[in-house]
């Protein structure tokens, strides 16, 4: 099914490429045309980008920006195909780390280092820790647009009603979950119909249970083995939470379980800080992923990563494309992002008392103050390894695989990836 979908995407993009080759990136009236591709065809991001483009075009009447957007999972396939054509988008969305690095190694992304160096008024206003995940071999290839990280959300009203405190350790998390379940609440909302939600737990648990040097080696496509016992222990920890998740985790998606949390049917959810606005009006509290006895990784590391945009190495208009990205990541547009969308700009000082709640500002500070960041797991490893991991864990959650069996499948995928990387 996935191969058929990819075939259809290739066919459709090929037809568009043929059509695109007959036109010019500069129109007859002298305007420069830029193609802008992102992953938010739905509100509120859809209107946000349309309004940003409209304002930019008003200030730059010689530039016309054509927007195209597809949803998350479709985007991952389509952008890879589009960048392989002779008419790729000039500006395109990208997750950071390995997802972006593949495009860089494939010469699909423009080196933006000179823009960072020559326009420090712009580059210095970015949160510096958010630039690094788009940096490859000491060169900058992407512009961070928004910051995001994981945290446990909890319903303060439910916790106060049952006289519960936010857990600081794993044992306390289990104890709190037991008490919530005894009082008729679903302790933790979790939906894995779309498997990306699994990667957030796995990324965090691997960081806690496996030492950093081993993880770095295993996450590298050329050297990954995944034989350390910490990976099995991480999955066993996830298994310990299974009695406290909602029923049928593999049959429901994240949006559904988030709504369950919002309606007060569940008391906790491991969510992205960018989702705070989506669970209003819950009396919301947050706590970091609890410390685990015997863990090898730091509790001060935060799971999360920036998302941003890159410019195609094939663009005929790098200057104009960069002008748009600098406009998109200006302080004014960053403040608009926080206010209109509820996401957090990678521009410093954009979450204020005027456009963000106290807990949103707390979330931003949490990211800025983090000692280190743990990238989204499925964006930090080879896609074959990620698929083996997420499919295996989904089966484990359904009772069809053990942690050991999951890791055997991951080790097999890693071996194949190593062979192809040689």
From Swiss-Prot:
S-diacylglycerol cysteine: lipidated positions: 21
InterPro entries for this protein: Bact_solute-bd_prot1, SBP
Subcellular location field: Cell membrane
The entry's keywords: Cell membrane, Lipoprotein, Membrane, Palmitate, Signal, Transport
Lipidation, N-palmitoyl cysteine type: 21
Entry keyword annotation includes Cell membrane: yes
Signal peptide: 1-20
One GO CC term on file: plasma membrane
The keyword Cell inner membrane is annotated on this UniProt entry: no
Membrane topology: Lipid-anchor
Principal cellular location given in the protein's record: membrane
Function summary: Probably part of the binding-protein-dependent transport system YurMNO.
Membership in a protein family: Belongs to the bacterial solute-binding protein 1 family.
Protein name, as recorded: Uncharacterized ABC transporter extracellular-binding protein YurO
Organism: Bacillus subtilis (strain 168)
Phylogenetic classification of the source organism: Bacteria, Bacillati, Bacillota, Bacilli, Bacillales
């Amino acid at each position: 099914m996935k191969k058929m979908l990819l075939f259809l995407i290739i066919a459709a993009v090929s037809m568009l490429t043929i059509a695109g080759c007959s036109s010019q990136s500069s129109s007859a009236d002298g305007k420069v045309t830029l193609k802008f591709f992102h992953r938010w065809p739905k509100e509120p991001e859809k209107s946000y980008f349309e309004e940003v483009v409209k304002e930019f075009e008003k200030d730059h009447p010689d530039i016309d920006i054509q927007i195209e957007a597809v949803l998350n999972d479709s985007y991952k396939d389509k952008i890879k195909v589009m960048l392989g054509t002779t008419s790729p988008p000039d500006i395109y969305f990208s997750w950071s780390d390995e997802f972006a690095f593949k495009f860089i190694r494939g010469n699909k992304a423009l080196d933006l280092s000179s823009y960072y160096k020559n326009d420090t008024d712009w580059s210095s206003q970015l949160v510096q820790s958010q630039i690094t995940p788009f940096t490859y071999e000491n060169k900058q290839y992407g512009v961070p647009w928004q910051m995001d990280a994981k945290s446990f959300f909890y319903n303060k009203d439910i916790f106060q009603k049952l006289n519960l405190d936010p857990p600081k350790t794993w044992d306390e998390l289990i104890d709190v979950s037991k008490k919530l379940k005894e009082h008729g609440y679903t302790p933790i909302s979790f939906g894995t119909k779309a498997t990306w939600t699994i990667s957030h737990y796995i990324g965090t648990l691997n960081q806690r249970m496996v030492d950093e040097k081993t993880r770095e080696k295993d996450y590298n496509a050329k050297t990954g083995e995944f034989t350390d016992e910490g990976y099995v222990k991480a999955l066993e920890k996830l298994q310990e939470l299974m009695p406290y998740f909602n029923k049928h985790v593999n049959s429901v998606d994240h949006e559904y379980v988030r709504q369950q949390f919002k309606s007060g049917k569940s008391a906790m959810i491991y969510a992205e800080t960018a989702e705070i606005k989506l669970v209003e009006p819950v009396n919301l509290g947050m706590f970091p992923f609890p410390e685990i006895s015997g863990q090898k990784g730091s509790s001060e590391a935060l799971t999360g990563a920036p998302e941003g945009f890159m410019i195609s190495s094939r663009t005929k208009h790098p200057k104009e494309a960069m002008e748009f990205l600098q406009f998109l990541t200006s302080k004014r547009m960053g403040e608009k992002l926080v206010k209109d969308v509820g996401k957090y700009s990678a521009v410093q000082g954009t979450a204020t008392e005027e456009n963000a709640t106290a807990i949103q500002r707390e979330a931003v500070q949490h990211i800025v103050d983090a000692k280190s960041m743990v990238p989204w797991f499925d964006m930090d490893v080879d896609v074959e390894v990620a698929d083996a991991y997420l499919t295996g864990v989904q089966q484990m959650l359904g009772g069809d695989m053990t942690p050991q069996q999951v890791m055997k499948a991951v080790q097999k995928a890693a071996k194949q990836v190593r062979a192809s990387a040689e």
